[in-house]
């Protein structure tokens, strides 16, 4: 009895037979789990079934793999997941390292970096001229050159010390630079003289080399601070080079400078290198990508070709200016280089001056109005200004002002004649042209046919008012005669011509009802439908008997 009670109380478990295919799959699954495979691969294996089934339940059928299961074997997406996880881990670890090595705001302020950047931003916004002021390096006097050469001798301890100095020391010199900028500036005459002097080809090449590499020993801080002048208010016009070689070298150097100034973000400025080649590291310098350099070269070439083609056209048009055009052709490359230098110094006023020199004939496109300065601060780059004019993104005030300036600067008739746009003619030439036109017109008019000829051809008909009135009277008489001859209705009935529809069709009297709308009294109720169905069934019962094979198709079956 105890055994029976135990048996009734708990479910008896029985083992599966060895012939059951699901046992094989279960054993393989357990073996793979014991082998210690990756968790990613374990996701793909089917879930292990229980080894013992409850008694009284049928064994489930063999599970069939779907067609999509074979795709998992071929493509193995869990391996892709594994690779993705590894990549994510690498990136996260790299980011954590960077964040750990990142300097705080307080440290940057201590070093003097952050304060300087804020002051730069303030100077940009507060500049009254429009463009951001460019810090120009003044070529030092011969005395300072000798001093620097003595200091930078390889044997001296100062030079060795500066060689070993890391990047942190030049970064800390930014604070000294700010102090130097706050110092009282020199007189306006001295500033103009200092600004007008520009570094020669050797100095420019040295400046490029100094900006690219930090190998050259930096100067002592006291001297660099002393030699940095206060920035001049206006950018200075670049002087023309003397020989072809100097032209080429300066052109290349300024091209690279311009491209770097354009490509660099406003927050990141490049190194300012003095003529001796020692870089004063103001902020971090981002290296220029080669694609940008190529773009700048292409742009410079395009401007050169445009100038050449324009001046070639001018020389064809006006024979008086051929000698001037030849000279301008030779100096076209020089002009291109000057323009690039102007971009590198970010001088808005200088751009306007050079544009006025180069495009005297293109007066309409010049912006001379001083009221436009405030609105066009954002559009100091010519290309950006042109794009904004074409796309219509300029503010409305700017558009109006530009239109007014263009209309004001429209060239006169004499100027157009001088430039061979409007043909130059004397009074005699004009008279001859008029006579030729008159001759052509008179010849055409003489070829027109006369009135008699048109009447003869029956094209033109001469009419009087009397004849027209007579024609109208005749038409009225004809119409009234026809109307009088019409028979009356009675005559037509007598002749049985006009017969009514009701004469030969039986017409039953019926109530008139509104056929237009779907009204509730027009709709059939349930009782109406039942009556119709009953009537139909009665009609069907009186008709011919339905065949036995098609009785299921009919609604009515005779009892």
From Swiss-Prot:
Q: Which GO terms describe its molecular function?
A: actin binding; protein phosphatase inhibitor activity
Gene3D superfamilies xrefs: 6.10.140.1750, 6.10.140.2130
User: What ranges does the record list as Low complexity composition bias?
Assistant: 25-35
Carrying Phosphoserine, the residues are 230
- Composition-biased stretches (Pro residues): 229-240
Tell me the segments the record calls region Disordered.
1-65, 82-342
Which positions are tagged coiled coil?
346-369, 450-486
Keywords tagged on the record: Actin-binding, Coiled coil, Nucleus, Phosphoprotein, Protein phosphatase inhibitor, Repeat
Q: In which tissues is it expressed?
A: Abundantly expressed in brain. Also found in several tumors such as lung carcinomas, nervous tumors and HL-60 leukemia cells. Isoform 3 is the major form in U-937, GOTO and HL-60 leukemia cells.
Q: Which residues carry this modification: Phosphothreonine?
A: 70, 236
Q: Please, which domain of life does this record's source organism belong to?
A: Eukaryota
**Primary residence:** nucleus
Q: What induces it?
A: Down-regulated in HL-60 leukemia cells by RA, PMA and dimethyl sulfoxide.
Mind listing the GO biological process terms from this record?
actin cytoskeleton organization
A single Gene Ontology CC term: nuclear matrix
Span list, region Required for PP1CA binding and inhibition of PP1 activity: 438-518
What InterPro entries does its record include? RPEL_repeat
Q: Describe, as the record does, how this protein assembles with itself and its partners.
A: Binds actin and PPP1CA; thus inhibiting the protein phosphatase 1 (PP1) activity.
Family note: Belongs to the phosphatase and actin regulator family.
Instruction: Name the chain's protein.
Output: Phosphatase and actin regulator 3
Q: Which organism is it from?
A: Homo sapiens
The gene name on file is: PHACTR3
């Amino acid at each position: 009895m105890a055994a029976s009670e135990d048996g009734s109380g708990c479910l008896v478990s029985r083992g599966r037979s060895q012939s059951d295919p699901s046992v094989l799959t279960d054993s393989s699954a357990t073996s793979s789990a014991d082998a210690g495979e990756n968790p990613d691969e374990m996701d793909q294996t089917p879930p292990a079934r229980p080894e013992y089934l409850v008694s009284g339940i049928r064994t489930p059928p063999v599970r069939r793999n779907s067609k999509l299961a074979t795709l998992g074997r071929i493509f193995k997406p869990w391996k892709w997941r594994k690779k993705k996880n590894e990549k994510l881990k690498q990136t996260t670890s790299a980011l954590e390292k960077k964040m750990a090595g990142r300097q705080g705001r307080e440290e940057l302020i201590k070093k003097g970096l952050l304060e300087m950047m804020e002051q730069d931003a303030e100077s940009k916004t507060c500049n009254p001229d429009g463009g951001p002021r460019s810090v120009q390096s003044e070529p030092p006097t011969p005395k300072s050159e000798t001093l620097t050469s003595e200091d930078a001798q390889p044997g001296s301890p100062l030079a060795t010390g500066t060689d070993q100095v890391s990047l942190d020391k030049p970064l800390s010199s930014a604070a000294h630079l700010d102090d130097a900028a706050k110092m009282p500036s020199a007189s306006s005459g001295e500033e103009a003289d200092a600004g007008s002097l520009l570094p020669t080809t050797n100095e420019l090449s040295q400046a490029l080399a100094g900006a690219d590499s930090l190998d050259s020993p930096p100067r002592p801080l006291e001297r660099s601070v002393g030699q940095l002048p206060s920035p001049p208010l206006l950018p200075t016009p670049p002087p023309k080079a003397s020989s072809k070689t100097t032209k080429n070298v300066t052109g290349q150097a300024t091209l690279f400078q311009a491209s770097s100034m354009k490509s660099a973000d406003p927050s990141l400025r490049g190194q300012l290198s003095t003529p001796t080649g020692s870089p004063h590291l103001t902020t971090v310098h981002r290296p220029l990508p080669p694609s940008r350099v190529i773009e700048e070269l292409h742009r410079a070439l395009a401007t050169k070709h445009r100038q050449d083609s324009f001046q070639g056209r001018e020389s064809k048009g006006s024979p008086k200016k051929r000698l001037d055009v030849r000279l301008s052709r030779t100096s076209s490359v020089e002009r291109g280089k000057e323009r690039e230098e102007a971009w590198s110094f970010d001088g808005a006023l200088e751009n306007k001056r050079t544009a006025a020199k180069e495009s005297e004939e293109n007066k309409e496109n010049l912006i001379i109005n001083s009221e436009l300065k405030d609105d066009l601060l954002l559009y100091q780059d010519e290309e950006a200004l042109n794009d904004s004019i074409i796309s219509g993104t300029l503010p409305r005030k700017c558009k109006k002002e530009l239109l007014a300036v263009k209309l004001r600067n429209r060239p006169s008739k004499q100027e157009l004649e001088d430039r061979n746009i409007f043909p130059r003619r004397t009074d005699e030439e004009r008279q001859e042209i008029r006579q030729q036109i008159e001759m052509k017109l008179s010849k055409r008019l003489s070829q027109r046919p006369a009135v008699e000829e048109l009447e003869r051809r029956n094209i033109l008909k001469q009419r009087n008012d009397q004849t027209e009135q007579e024609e109208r009277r005749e038409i009225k008489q004809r119409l009234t005669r026809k109307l009088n001859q019409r028979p009356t209705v009675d005559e037509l009935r007598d002749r049985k011509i006009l017969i009514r529809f009701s004469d030969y069709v039986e017409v039953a009297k019926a109530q008139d009802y509104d056929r237009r709308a779907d009204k509730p009294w027009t709709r059939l109720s349930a009782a109406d439908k039942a009556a119709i169905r009953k009537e139909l069934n009665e009609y069907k019962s009186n008709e011919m008997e339905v065949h036995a094979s098609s009785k299921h198709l009919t609604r009515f079956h005779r009892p």
